[in-house]
Amino acid sequence: MAPSYKLTYCPVKALGEPIRFLLSYGEKDFEDYRFQEGDWPNLKPSMPFGKTPVLEIDGKQTHQSVAISRYLGKQFGLSGKDDWENLEIDMIVDTISDFRAAIANYHYDADENSKQKKWDPLKKETIPYYTKKFDEVVKANGGYLAAGKLTWADFYFVAILDYLNHMAKEDLVANQPNLKALREKVLGLPAIKAWVAKRPPTDL
């Protein structure tokens, strides 16, 4: 019997979208529960460590976006062929998480003075550094982020790209031809194209 899936997350793409991409690619039906802000106080105590996204698999709760994505990648043939390739995938996904954290450090800063000071280093140093490096990695891997083939790392990156772009206030791959081609490649997959066409529209 096929497992049942229920994703619990707020009504945005962000860290829930890699999971939605992977479930769609795996042609799995899933309940996409998007709670509203007012629902969170009652929902939070039932979530592991009080955070989302949470993916229930046959009623069993799993959490942490990267861990869930890694699991789904294995389920759907998107992991490495050996430990070395899986290390390559994990390294690049962890680096994507570092990049996200650097942008989020600016975006979520509630102190406007502090936020202003972070803007120039982010735009002139951090973003160009990471996007150039990622572009070089994709070029060296034959058009992919790791292992020279399509893996869950590619889905993870493309799925959170709208979120990263929203926080950074720019299209991060616009001037990086290999990253841009990777985005088009993933979004062009029939299952992903179908998901993107039917998902609720959100900015991030």
UniProtKB/Swiss-Prot annotation:
- Top-level division of the source organism's lineage: Eukaryota
Region forming the signal peptide: none
Q: Which reaction is catalysed here?
A: RX + glutathione = an S-substituted glutathione + a halide anion + H(+)
| GST C-terminal domain span | 82-204
Gene3D superfamilies linked = 1.20.1050.10, Glutaredoxin (3.40.30.10)
Q: Where does glutathione bind?
A: 9, 40, 44, 50-52, 64-65
Which EC class is the enzyme in?
A: transferase
Example of a GO biological process term: glutathione metabolic process
Q: Which Pfam families match?
A: GST_C_3, GST_N
EC number(s) given by UniProt: 2.5.1.18
Among its keywords, does the record have Disulfide bond?
A: no
What family name appears in the similarity comment? Belongs to the GST superfamily. Sigma family.
Q: Report the protein name in the record.
A: Glutathione S-transferase
What organism is this sequence from?
Blattella germanica
